[in-house]
């Protein structure tokens, strides 16, 4: 299109300018209306790029800037498959081949004008000699444009063989000698399973596992100073002789910003320097253990997660269903393996934090055996005789109600030292975490008054599965749910300030998997099941003074009608 080449890759749209070699990315944040693009086609006379989404939504991108959404086909009440396979152009019309017919769009009016139901999977279509031809899985059909093509009787089968037709309208000749890679400044994959800030550098891994592996390519990305970078992937499997995928988390060395460790869902941990792989720790060269030590595939079940440094620069980690579920790589290179009987059978250990007291907390997300583990090692890592530790699988709330079958997905400590955990039963609050080892310890389910003169209240986000919680500079809670978008909750949990969903905002998906907040700017990075989006919040970390560089007036990229 002019000097620009529009590229569809992995469901995302880019424009590459051949003159200045710049790359522009298009997204739901601006200007697109949806995510997961499956097909694009361009009509030059009306300067319209037709954008088809996997959910059958349709956009028209006109003059490279203006977007017109045509959602009627996506919203149409029909039992047939709505998949769109192909587009062709004739005069002011675009004909879209679908899994059950042909959809006609008027580009001049920018509206859907007709739908011709053929009750067949139309692979491609074209107009010739005043006939609309449809190549289907049952042969080639044709309809005269001057007739009523809404009536299926006006479509005639003209051939059983569609191969020549499909070859003519699907094959694209290739010209050129040397291919050129075009790499946009963007994430290498839409897998923001884990996110965390190390200073002002955003660290992201692709994940992950639940009960089983997700089989995602080993993905580690960083975002800093508006630049995306990726860690080495190629060659790691060849060096370790094992698969390299499902990276659960990453941690940056507090003493060396170029030094990182990453944990996997089955192969132990990987060490990187300047983004390059330098070492691998497995059951064969470290005390890390397998969940199935006696099986032939034992070295693919070294399930490590929760990498975190303590204040002394020792690297802690947790592993699933092992005799020594807590391991520490000391700053001098020695290993310490810790045995706590109550977590030997704990599954899906995930997120970890060190609280203000220096206690270690670790979440376990398997409903049948999940819970929250806390360890006070009293400053003596190798000596467990003075340790306090407890694994709670059934919490009691402030009313004495027992919360069973609890899966704990995430954890965060707020500015007041209160600990918030996200569970399959909603958020739970530990107002007095120092009493966690007491037999009478209880959690709090926040009660939000209905304010309808009934005197009744509801538990905050009760029975919502909470995948992520992050605390912003104003001590507010950003809470990401598994299927209902993201909430911004007041510091005390009593007020919902915002509730963003894919329906009322540029949020890519209602399935939130991770949240991280930039410590200086307050920008909220939200990992979803369809990729990453950010929101410029109005709360930043406290600074010593107000100055132009750290204060922004009402920063809000979300349009006013979304609030």
Predicted regions: what is each one?
Residues 27-33, 71-79, 155-186, 229-243, ...:
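Surface-exposed loop and turn segments in beta-propeller and other repeat-based domains
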Residues 14, 56-58, 101-103, 139-141, ...:
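Short glycine/acidic-enriched loop and turn motifs that connect beta-strands
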Residues 426, 511-546:
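Blade-level signature of beta-propeller repeat domains, shared across WD40, Kelch, NHL, RCC1
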Residues 2, 42-46, 89-91, 127-129, ...:
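Residue-level detector of Asp-centered blade-edge/turn motifs that repeat once per structural unit
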Residues 36-39, 83-85, 184-194, 243-250, ...:
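Signature of short aromatic-glycine-proline-rich micro-motifs recurring in repeat-based ectodomains
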Residues 254, 544-563:
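Surface-exposed, proline-anchored Ser/Thr-rich loop/turn motifs
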